[in-house]
């Protein structure tokens, strides 16, 4: 686990890039700090499901809903939450699902046709049907009746814990143990570790405008192209001190600039944070940058490109992410391999001529030099750990974290 010195160093390094963290807890009006899920419809209103009820936030005021205020709510532990196109709110619990519409609660359980009371995820397809991922399978509600699917229909063991839809309106679902599931409305197709998926525990899925599937697993991020063939795996979006590299993904989302945001939590280290990908390189954020806590549970990007990160300690909102993320120099600059055993290569295809400083986690400059070619080698004889490259091209300064094994 990173120590305080690492936190302070990386705080000053990343904080200089300009993003803002705003944190919310019970002191601000949140019903409970242990936040499990989040949703928004684009109106600027956020809804959060917690261990002890529901919180609605309009940017100024908080409204809380619990079984004490609304007796129709089946449980205070909210396992899934979704605001629908028509404004209805659906929430999932371990005892069934609830719909809040026109100030009225309606509950659905197995007695009403639900396949399993233990809801994990709720979403809506373009035709207005409600899709409910459950511990034991899938239920689809057409407004009147439920259609249910489970292992006998082809869903692998592990149930459904995430659902997204592609450009062809096929559903892509994450299984708790069985991998990535494609459902065309008739049959299920399974993609698992035999197809290159990093791990068969799939926690989150997001599909981009090229119909690529970004699949968050318990071992990292797998990307399948529009032909559903594995394109790439990412296992170190959020850098950890050696020898730890595991990056379990808890949430995914794209903003309007096509920046990918990834929530990561490594439970055995009690460490976690948020990684951002600009299509070329990763930047990560953690508690040292202002994130409220390491136990990431969900991540939602709203229509204003605000990134809402839910944790067991409260909520962080990330805003004002600077345009450096799409800067040509940064995109063209490669530092590889990273991590390394001590030898790093720096390559830039667009220009040459840099002043580079290598700093340790305390901010001390270990060496400084000038690079005049497009490709250069750096030797780092120091001990294993996290270091920072400060790179200046004469007009701008950039930072890259490097890890020496």
Which residues make up each language-model segment?
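Carboxylate-rich, polar loop motifs that coordinate divalent cations or form catalytic acidic clusters
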Residues: 3, 16-327
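Local alpha-helix boundary/kink/capping signal
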Residues: 11, 316, 343-345
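Generic detector of short, well-ordered, non-transmembrane alpha-helical segments enriched
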Residues: 14-15, 383
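C-terminal outer-membrane/trafficking sorting elements
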Residues: 328-336, 340-405
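Sec-dependent N-terminal signal peptides
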Residues: 4-14
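Positively charged n-region of N-terminal signal peptides that target proteins for export
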Residues: 1-4, 404-405
């Amino acid at each position: 686990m990173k120590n305080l010195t690492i936190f302070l160093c990386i705080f000053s390094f990343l904080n200089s890039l300009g993003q803002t963290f705003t944190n919310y807890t019970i002191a601000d009006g949140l019903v409970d700090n242990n936040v499990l899920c989040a949703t928004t419809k684009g109106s600027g209103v956020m809804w959060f499901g917690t261990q002890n009820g529901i919180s609605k936030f309009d940017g100024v005021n908080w409204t809380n809903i619990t079984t004490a205020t609304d007796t129709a709510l089946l449980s205070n532990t909210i396992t899934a939450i979704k605001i629908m196109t028509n404004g209805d709110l659906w929430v999932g619990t371990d005892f069934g699902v609830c719909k809040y519409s026109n100030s009225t609660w309606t509950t659905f359980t197995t007695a009403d046709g639900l396949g399993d009371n233990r809801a994990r995820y709720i979403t809506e397809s373009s035709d207005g049907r409600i899709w409910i991922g459950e511990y034991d399978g899938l239920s689809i509600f057409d407004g009147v009746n439920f259609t249910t699917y489970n292992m006998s229909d082809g869903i692998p063991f592990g149930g459904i814990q995430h659902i997204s839809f592609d450009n062809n309106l096929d559903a892509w679902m994450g299984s708790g143990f069985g991998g990535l599931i494609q459902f065309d409305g008739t049959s299920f197709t399974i993609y698992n570790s035999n197809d290159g998926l990093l791990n068969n525990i799939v926690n989150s899925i997001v599909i981009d405008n090229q119909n690529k599937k970004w699949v968050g697993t318990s071992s990292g991020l797998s990307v399948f192209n529009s032909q559903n063939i594995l394109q790439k795996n990412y296992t170190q979006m959020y850098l950890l001190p050696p020898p730890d590299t595991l990056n379990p993904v808890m949430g995914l989302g794209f903003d309007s600039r096509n920046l990918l945001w990834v929530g990561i939590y490594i439970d055995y280290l009690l460490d976690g944070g948020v990684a951002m990908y600009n299509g070329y390189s990763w930047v990560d954020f953690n508690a040292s940058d202002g994130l409220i806590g390491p136990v990431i549970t969900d991540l939602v990007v709203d229509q204003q490109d605000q990134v809402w990160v839910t944790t067991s300690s409260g909520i962080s909102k990330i805003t004002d992410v600077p345009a450096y993320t799409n800067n040509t120099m940064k995109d063209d600059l490669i530092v590889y391999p990273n991590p390394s055993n001590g030898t790093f290569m720096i390559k830039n295809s667009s220009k040459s001529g840099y002043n580079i400083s290598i700093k340790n986690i305390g901010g001390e400059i270990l060496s400084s030099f000038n690079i005049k070619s497009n490709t250069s080698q750096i030797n780092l004889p120091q001990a294993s750990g996290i270091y920072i490259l400060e790179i200046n091209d004469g007009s701008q300064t950039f930072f890259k974290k490097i890890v020496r094994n």
